[in-house]
Curated annotation (Swiss-Prot):
GO cellular component, one term: cytoplasm
Family: Belongs to the FKBP-type PPIase family. Tig subfamily.
Protein localization: Cytoplasm
UniProt protein name: Trigger factor
Gene (UniProt): tig
InterPro entries: PPIase_dom_sf (IPR046357), PPIase_FKBP_dom (IPR001179), Trig_fac (IPR005215), Trigger_fac_C (IPR008880), Trigger_fac_C_sf (IPR037041), Trigger_fac_ribosome-bd_bac (IPR008881), Trigger_fac_ribosome-bd_sf (IPR036611), Trigger_fact/SurA_dom_sf (IPR027304)
Length: 435
C-alpha cells in the first residue's frame, strides 16, 4: 500500500491510497476463508466448503465485505501512523476490489488545526464572594408564609387589588363565535402577579363582586396560541368574589408545618447554607467562564466546517426549543431560519474554538475521562429527560454521540484544571443594578 496526504486546508486532509493487485487478492482470499468457516452450505460439512463454491454463491457479499474491511484496516493504519485524528465523518470515494487488478481510493476528512497554545496557568481572575442578604431571607420567609396563607373573601365592597384574588368566570369570542379553550368557571385569578394578560387583569380590577362586563382584548404577537396571536377578541367576565390571602405569623409551628423545619432559626440557617452553596457554585462558574473567555478571545485559527455546522444546528434547535417550552412558536421569534443561524453563528464559533482549546489543554496535561464518568453523565441526562438509562445509552451509541459526550466531559475537566491553577481574587458581590 502506498498513500499520499494532501493538505487541502488547515483543517482538511485528502489521502490518496494505492493498493497493488497482490494485496487485493490477499484481502479477497481472507474474506473467502472467513465465509468457509462461518457460513453453512447445504451438502457440505461446515468448514469443508470448497472456495470455488463459496465464491460463486456469495460473490457480491464477499467483494463488498473485502472492500470495506481492507479500506477500514488501511485507514486506521494510516491515521494512527500519521497521528491524524478526524473530527468529521470520513468520506470515502472508492469502487470495488477486482481480483488481479490494482485498487485505489480517496478519503477526505477534517482535523483540528494546529495552533500555538497560550499560557493558561496562574492567570488572574476575580470571583464574587457568595453572600445571602437579609432581604433574600425575608423573601423566602414570605413565600413560605404565602404557601400557608388562608384565602378568604374581603369584607369591603370593591374590586380586587394587586396581591389579591378575583374569583371569575370568563369566556372569549371572536366575530361572535366562542374561542375554544379561552374560558373558565369560578377560577381564582391572582391579581398583579403576571399570570394572565395585563389588559385582562386591568379590566377585572374594575369589577366588584357580583358584577359582569365585557371588553376587547388584543392578544400579543408571541401569544402561546399562534392562531390568536395579534388578534382581538371580546372577553366576557363575571366576578363572583374578591379574596385575600391571610398569612400567618412566622413561628416555629408554622415553619414545621410548612417545610418540616425544627424552628424559624433553623429554617433561616438551612436556607442560608443552601443559597450560599448554590451562589458559590454560580460565582465559580462565572469566574471560570471569564477566565477561559479571556484566553480564547486571543486565539485565531480556522474551525472545522463540520464541527461548526453541528454546533450551529444544536444552538438553533436550543433557541427554538426554549421558545416552544415557554409556549411560543418559531414564527413568534420574528426571524427566518437563516437570520436565526446568523445570529447564533458568533456564539457557535466561540463555543467550538473554546472546546478545541480546552481539549488541547487536556491532551497537554494528560487528563482523561473514565468509563464510569461517561456512565454518570448518561445517568444525569436520563434523570433530566425523565427517561430510563438504557434508552438514553442506546440513543447516544446509535447516533455516535458518546465521543462528543466524552469530549465535553474532558473539556470540562480542562476548564476546572485552569481554574484550580488560576490566581483567584475574591471581591464583594456586585449589586444587581450595577451588573
Amino acid at each position: 500500500m502506498d498513500f499520499n496526504i494532501e493538505e487541502v486546508s488547515a483543517v482538511e486532509r485528502e489521502i490518496k491510497v494505492s493498493v497493488p493487485a497482490e494485496e487485493v487478492g490477499a484481502a479477497l482470499d481472507a474474506t473467502v476463508a472467513l465465509y468457509k468457516v462461518q457460513t453453512p452450505v447445504k451438502g457440505f460439512r461446515k468448514g469443508k466448503v470448497p472456495a470455488s463454491v463459496i465464491q460463486s454463491k456469495y460473490k457480491k457479499q464477499i467483494i463488498n465485505e473485502a472492500t470495506t474491511d481492507l479500506i477500514n484496516y488501511q485507514i486506521n493504519d494510516i491515521l494512527n501512523g500519521q497521528s491524524l485524528v478526524p473530527v468529521s465523518k470520513i468520506d470515502v470515494d472508492a469502487k470495488e476490489l477486482v481480483r488481479g487488478e490494482d485498487f485505489s481510493y480517496v478519503i477526505k476528512f477534517e482535523i483540528v488545526p494546529e495552533f500555538d497554545t497560550p499560557g493558561y496557568l496562574g492567570l488572574p481572575v476575580e470571583e464574587e464572594r457568595a453572600e445571602v442578604t437579609e432581604d433574600e431571607l425575608k423573601e423566602v420567609e414570605n413565600r413560605l408564609l404565602q404557601s400557608m396563607a388562608k384565602i378568604a373573601p374581603i369584607e369591603d365592597d370593591r374590586p380586587a387589588k394587586d396581591g389579591e384574588l378575583a374569583s371569575v368566570t370568563f369566556s372569549a369570542e371572536m366575530d361572535g363565535e366562542p374561542i375554544p379553550g379561552v374560558q373558565a368557571d369560578n377560577f381564582d385569578l391572582p391579581i398583579g402577579e403576571g399570570h394572565s394578560l395585563e389588559e385582562f387583569e386591568e379590566f377585572v380590577k374594575t369589577l366588584k363582586a357580583g358584577e359582569s362586563g365585557e371588553t376587547d382584548i388584543t392578544f400579543p404577537e408571541d401569544f402561546i396560541n399562534s392562531d390568536l396571536a395579534g388578534k382581538t377578541a371580546t372577553m366576557k367576565v363575571t366576578v363572583h368574589a374578591v379574596k385575600e390571602r391571610k398569612m400567618p405569623e412566622l413561628t416555629d409551628d408554622v415553619v414545621k408545618q410548612a417545610g418540616g423545619f425544627e424552628s424559624v432559626e433553623k429554617m433561616r440557617e438551612i436556607v442560608k447554607q443552601s443559597y450560599t452553596a448554590n451562589r458559590k457554585q454560580l460565582n465559580k462558574s462565572a469566574a471560570q467562564t471569564k477566565l477561559i473567555s479571556g484566553i480564547v478571545k486571543e486565539l485565531d485559527f480556522p474551525l472545522p466546517p463540520s464541527l461548526m455546522e453541528d454546533r450551529l444546528q444544536r444552538m438553533v434547535a436550543d433557541v427554538i426549543g426554549r421558545a416552544e417550552r415557554s409556549g411560543k412558536s418559531f414564527e413568534s421569534l420574528g426571524k427566518s431560519m437563516e437570520e436565526l443561524r446568523e445570529e447564533q453563528r458568533p456564539v457557535a464559533e466561540e463555543s467550538v474554538r473554546t472546546e478545541i482549546f480546552l481539549l488541547n489543554v487536556a491532551k497537554r496535561e494528560e487528563l482523561s475521562v473514565e468509563p464510569q464518568e461517561v456512565e454518570g453523565a448518561l445517568y444525569q441526562i436520563a434523570q433530566q429527560t425523565q427517561q430510563d438509562l438504557s434508552s438514553v445509552k442506546s440513543y447516544y451509541e446509535e447516533n455516535n454521540l458518546i465521543v462528543p459526550l466524552k469530549d465535553r466531559l474532558l473539556a470540562d475537566k480542562a476548564a476546572e484544571f485552569i481554574y484550580e491553577n488560576a490566581d483567584v481574587t475574591e471581591i464583594d458581590p456586585v449589586k444587581k443594578d450595577d451588573k
